[in-house]
């Protein structure tokens, strides 16, 4: 006989546990009210002879109570019922008081290190975290089925963003910025008309970004090409002003020169507005907006030359950096820059190679931009090229009523991630057991994902006018539900995964870079991808496989499994699990081989994936970056460079600030260890982080080896 526990797990029946529970209750009452050993054995025998192959914990508890009452053991039954009720209350009791008070006193280390772009000492950020703690508590106690909540607690799966689940908001999106700029929008009840100049368009764009960020919990992306139209408007405005002012008294060459000077000033000012506004704005999420600028030189666009000018200025300003409070230029975390490589700019003699060369300089100094290969992306997404939503989440192809592909104005409903290493730990190399456990846990993930979906059903557009009424996603009427955007593949649902390396090592004794590990890991990817396709076919919801960034989860899952299963070499003893399908950060492998191997996994993880290579300071060897960029174009859809970009405010050192043997960040020159007196920027997952990291992620960062 098997027992189905409250978290959904099915475990072998152990009658000793029932015997001990009744003995515990016996000890709480006078001897005359106690159950005899004979009665206890009778209860155990009846449970065994019930005839069911699988019993629930609740059903067995009901049987015990019935037996005690039938044998007139009312006092004992009452004690057992009260005990059972108290346990139920305990599971549903408020759990937030201590964590919130510790947060306010700056003593909650776990929360402080949860997000490397949130500073928990700030009152504004604390407000978000306090709300988040309440949301987590309500979600766990009241909103999720108990077995899903238990599965989350036990590290079977991770129900992402529970700190926002009580609100009817979604994860990430591609803003339909073209519609909002061209047709106007409304923010905070104030109409914003279509801009008449580039500077105003940049200002409005940052206002839209802030409003969108405050009404969702994940990242967002803006295709910068839609600003090209407004740069041309500024050029036309300046030309008309000169014509009105000087008429024929100035020759055309002089007029063109003045127009170009004024346009350059406006271009610089507009881009500066975007960079500084995004890095200084504080959303209701207690942080700068998680936003990506998509830099795509699309020659089919009539404003392509204006787009090139904007991209060049964005890259120039990013190379310069932003000033910290000491007035020193440092690497900003936002906005994330994603640059598209195509036939016209892939460093093979294309028309726009000069833009890519500037992008390479920028990556060498500031880590961004990251690179998308249009060539590989078209192979994966029915000939289309489009931005990720924020860090790495990609939409599935969808066509409107006219048969046209649509990307902007779509979104992701949410993410649930599966703990692959835990399955490997429990399977102990037995493939039959592995696939059985994977099946069971995928069904739990599906149920958890449907909780997210159902939480959005019936939501009306009024909850976020910027999204639903004024163009970021749609132009619905007030009071209209958002339901039509939740079905038929318009928006996506993500099944995330973490620790493919650890899972492979546990099952095959090697990494996924060699056989038999690689074949097994790819089979697991195919299996989970196919399961997403099956769910999509059954529900009409666009489920997709997503390589989880795992900023916090890399530590959380590893910590849970270490507590449950002890130190396991190369798995739990490291203190972290590896991001998604990535090669073990400690493995000595060159950049080209790493990208080549990981590209096979990227192609199966089309709901979200990004690969990186760790490089030294290459500001004096940009040609090495360019060589890898050429390789990215032909071999992998989405790649990025990790380098170091640090500054010690005590001594002025601007080399790499190291992690010492005590896992402390320390300036190698003056030995400063004060986080408040140093600027450290590292690749956290797909985004950069600059507010330091949890213990697991810090260990992972320290363990990274160079690939060039």
What are these regions (language model features)?
Residues 42-50, 421-427, 437, 503-506:
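Solvent-exposed, amphipathic alpha-helical segments
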Residues 493-506, 526, 683:
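Contiguous, well-ordered alpha-helical segments that form the cores/surfaces of helical PPI scaffolds
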């Amino acid at each position: 006989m098997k027992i189905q526990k409250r978290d959904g797990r099915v475990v072998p029946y152990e009658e000793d546990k029932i015997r001990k529970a009744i003995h515990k209750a016996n000890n709480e009452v006078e001897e005359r009210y106690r159950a005899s050993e004979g009665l206890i054995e009778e209860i155990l025998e009846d449970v065994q002879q019930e005839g069911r192959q699988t019993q629930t914990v609740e059903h067995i508890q009901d049987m015990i109570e019935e037996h005690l009452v039938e044998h007139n053991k009312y006092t004992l039954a009452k004690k057992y019922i009260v005990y059972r009720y108290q346990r139920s209350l305990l599971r549903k009791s408020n759990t937030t008081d201590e964590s919130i008070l510790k947060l306010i006193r700056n003593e909650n280390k776990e929360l402080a290190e949860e997000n490397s772009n949130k500073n928990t000492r700030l009152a504004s950020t604390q407000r978000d975290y306090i709300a988040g703690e309440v949301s987590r508590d309500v979600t766990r106690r009241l909103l999720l089925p108990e077995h899903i909540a238990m599965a989350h607690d036990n590290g079977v799966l991770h129900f992402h963003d529970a700190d926002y689940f009580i609100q009817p908001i979604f994860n990430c999106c591609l803003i339909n910025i073209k519609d909002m700029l061209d047709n106007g929008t409304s923010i905070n009840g104030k109409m914003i008309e279509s801009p008449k100049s580039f500077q105003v368009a940049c200002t409005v764009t940052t206002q839209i970004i802030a409003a969108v960020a405050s009404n969702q919990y994940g990242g967002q992306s803006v295709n910068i090409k839609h600003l090209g139209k407004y740069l041309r408007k500024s050029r036309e405005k300046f030309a008309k002003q000169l014509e009105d002012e000087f008429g024929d008294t100035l020759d055309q060459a002089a007029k063109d020169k003045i127009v170009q000077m004024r346009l350059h000033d406006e271009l610089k000012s507009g881009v500066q507005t975007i960079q500084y506004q995004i890095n200084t704005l504080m959303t209701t999420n207690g942080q700068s907006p998680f936003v990506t600028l998509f830099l795509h030189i699309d020659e089919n666009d009539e404003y392509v030359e204006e787009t090139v000018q904007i991209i060049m200025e964005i890259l120039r300003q990013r190379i310069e950096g932003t000033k910290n409070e000491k007035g020193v230029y440092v690497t900003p975390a936002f906005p994330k820059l994603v640059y598209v490589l195509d036939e016209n700019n892939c460093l093979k003699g294309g028309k726009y190679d000069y833009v890519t060369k500037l992008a390479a300089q920028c990556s060498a100094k500031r880590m961004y931009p990251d690179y998308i290969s249009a060539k590989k992306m078209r192979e994966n997404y029915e000939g289309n090229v489009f931005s990720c939503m924020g860090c790495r989440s990609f939409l599935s192809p969808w066509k409107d009523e006219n048969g046209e592909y649509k990307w902007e104005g779509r979104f992701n409903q949410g993410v649930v991630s599966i703990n692959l290493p835990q399955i490997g730990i429990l399977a102990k190399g037995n493939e039959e057991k592995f696939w059985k456990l994977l099946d069971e846990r995928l069904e739990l993930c599906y149920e958890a994902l449907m909780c997210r979906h159902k939480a959005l059903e019936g939501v009306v557009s009024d909850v976020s006018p910027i999204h639903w009424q004024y163009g970021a996603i749609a132009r619905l009427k007030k009071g209209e539900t958002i339901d039509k955007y939740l079905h038929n593949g318009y928006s996506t649902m993500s099944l995330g995964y973490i620790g493919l390396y650890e899972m492979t090592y546990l099952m095959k004794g090697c990494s996924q870079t060699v056989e038999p590990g690689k074949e097994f890991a790819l089979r697991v990817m195919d299996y989970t991808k196919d399961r997403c396709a099956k769910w999509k076919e059954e529900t009409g919801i666009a489920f997709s496989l997503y390589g989880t960034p795992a900023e916090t989860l890399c530590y959380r899952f590893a910590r849970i499994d270490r507590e449950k299963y002890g130190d396991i070499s190369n798995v739990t003893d490291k203190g972290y699990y590896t991001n998604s399908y990535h090669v073990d950060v400690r493995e000595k492998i060159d950049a080209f081989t790493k990208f080549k191997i990981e590209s096979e996994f990227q192609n199966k993880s089309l709901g979200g994936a990004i690969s990186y290579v760790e490089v030294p300071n290459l500001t004096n060897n940009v040609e090495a970056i360019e060589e890898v960029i050429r390789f990215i174009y032909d071999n992998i859809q989405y790649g990025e460079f990790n380098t170091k970009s640090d500054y010690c405010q005590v001594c002025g050192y601007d080399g790499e600030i190291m992690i010492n043997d005590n896992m402390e960040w320390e300036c190698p020159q003056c030995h400063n260890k004060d986080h408040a007196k140093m600027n450290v920027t590292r690749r956290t997952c797909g985004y950069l982080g600059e507010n330091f990291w949890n213990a697991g992620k810090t260990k992972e960062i320290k363990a990274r080896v160079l690939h060039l």
